[in-house]
From Swiss-Prot:
Superkingdom of source: Archaea
This protein's encoding gene: cca
Species of origin: Picrophilus torridus (strain ATCC 700027 / DSM 9790 / JCM 10055 / NBRC 100828 / KAW 2/3)
Protein name from the UniProt record: CCA-adding enzyme
GO MF term list: ATP binding; CCA tRNA nucleotidyltransferase activity; magnesium ion binding; tRNA binding
NCBIfam families reported in the protein's UniProt record: cca_archaeal
Residues binding ATP, per UniProt: 50, 53, 135, 155, 164
């Protein structure tokens, strides 16, 4: 029998950590209340996030929202909010989501102080962060200690199986989704059973599938116009289904702890290239969409030229690394070029264009015209170099094109190669 209490004990903050967080939170709230009152600001500080809900794991952050009256214009609200954030976090740095906010540390605890507008259930939001205090209220009102521990178990399970985290780089399940799922199904075990039997998309409530098209549809209990599961990828939904099936077949504690994965290097008989460039100093949520876009463009170029791409991988640290695996990286001297169907109005024009240029043809196969022509660009390296000059790889990456390197893999030490050869169900 699996010992959930032991697992929770390994991940749940102890009394000392909880007391320290409470003292820090109380101190921040008091200082904010004092300065808000002294400056006659129509706002109030609110503790949100997993700590305030009682669903946090060890080493959690503190999220303090300053909720403003809607009488303040957006620019003024943000300006006041940032000044209050810097008042609390003297060495804090400004970060940007939909609203700018201040992030820093107090006694080695990460603190985010976020300005937002105060809204009531059903009211129109100005930005997505405005819902967050309502999320906190919803979870507190709909959970008891047992459910909160089951929420923790689900978070632990998802983290260990690499499907937790709503950031763009992960595209997994957020903490709020874990809370909604456990509240909906009443226990951790019921959530796992649901995933193990799920066919197709996840849709809660079941009649919401037509309204939203994403793989995971979980209507936000505080805002029926929002799909809280929109960020979850089909791959991570699939991974969670498999993890749940495997867990129910063999219930053991290993499903709640990170697995050590070692690369399994082997000869593949393919051609592997690494495209590298320096990472710009911008946040993950901005850089990752550009890297994913660049990866897709490289793959599509390889396919269009006929290098027969097999797979790809990315890794983003201090450098951006994109791996592309090809069945071949050099093309033959002759390429077969497809023309229009013979029934097309363009068929005669195609013949006239190619009759004196083709190495062979034009000729017909079934109902289409073809020619054999000389391959102009034969190597993947040359093709990608040519295409890079005109490729749009995103606002921030475009500025770094001159620093892009294209390297043919030959047992070189790249993080993306380790990641590629470590790939399994959960990685």
């Amino acid at each position: 029998m699996i010992d959930y209490k032991k697992i929770l004990g390994d991940y749940t903050p102890d009394y000392e950590e909880s007391l320290r967080l409470k003292c820090i939170e109380n101190g921040i709230i008091k200082k904010l209340n004092d300065i808000i009152s002294s400056r006659n600001i129509d706002a109030e500080p609110v503790s949100v996030g997993s700590y305030s809900k009682g669903t946090n794991l060890k080493n959690s952050d503190l999220d303090i929202f300053i909720v403003f009256s809607k009488k303040y214009p957006k620019n003024e609200m943000e300006s006041i909010g940032l000044s209050l954030g810097h008042y609390i976090l003297e060495n804090g740095v400004e970060k940007y989501a939909e609203h700018p906010y201040v992030s820093g540390y107090i006694e080695n605890v990460k603190i985010d102080i976020v300005p937002a507008y105060k809204i009531e259930p059903g009211q129109r939001i100005v930005s997505t962060v405005d819902r967050t205090p309502l999320h906190t209220k919803y979870v507190i009102e709909n959970t008891d200690e047992n459910l909160r521990n089951d929420i923790r178990l689900l978070k632990i399970f998802m983290k260990a199986n690499n499907v937790y985290g709503s950031e763009v780089s992960k595209a997994g399940f957020s903490g709020y989704l874990c809370e909604i799922l456990v509240i909906n199904f009443k226990s951790f075990d019921a959530v796992i059973k649901y995933f193990s039997k799920l066919k197709g998309r996840l849709i809660i409530p079941e009649n919401s599938g037509k309204k939203f098209q994403e793989p995971v549809v979980i209507v936000d209990p505080v805002d029926p116009t929002r799909n809280a599961g929109a960020a979850v990828s089909l791959e991570n939904l699939s991974r969670m289904k498999i993890a749940s099936k495997l867990f129910l077949l063999n219930k053991n504690e290993s499903f709640f702890y990170p697995r050590e994965i070692s690369p399994r290097y082997h000869k593949r008989g393919t051609c592997i290239y690494i495209i590298t460039l320096k990472r710009p100093d911008i946040i993950d949520d901005i850089i990752y969409p550009q890297v994913f876009r660049f990866e897709r463009q490289i793959f599509n170029i390889a396919d269009r030229y006929g290098f027969m791409p097999v797979s790809s991988e990315i890794n983003v640290d201090n450098n951006i690394e994109i791996l592309i695996e090809l069945q071949r990286d050099v093309l033959p001297d002759v390429s077969k070029h497809a023309g229009p169907p013979v029934d097309s109005d363009e068929s005669i024009n195609f013949i006239n264009v190619w009759k004196d240029r083709a190495l062979r043809g034009p000729y017909i196969e079934r109902d289409r015209l073809y020619v054999d022509s000389e391959t102009r660009i034969k190597s993947f390296y040359d093709a990608l170099n040519l295409e890079l000059k005109k490729m749009d790889i995103g606002k921030n990456l475009n500025k770094l094109k001159d620093g892009i390197k294209i390297i043919k893999y030959n047992n070189s030490d790249f993080n993306v190669v380790k990641k590629f050869f470590s790939k399994d169900i959960f990685h």
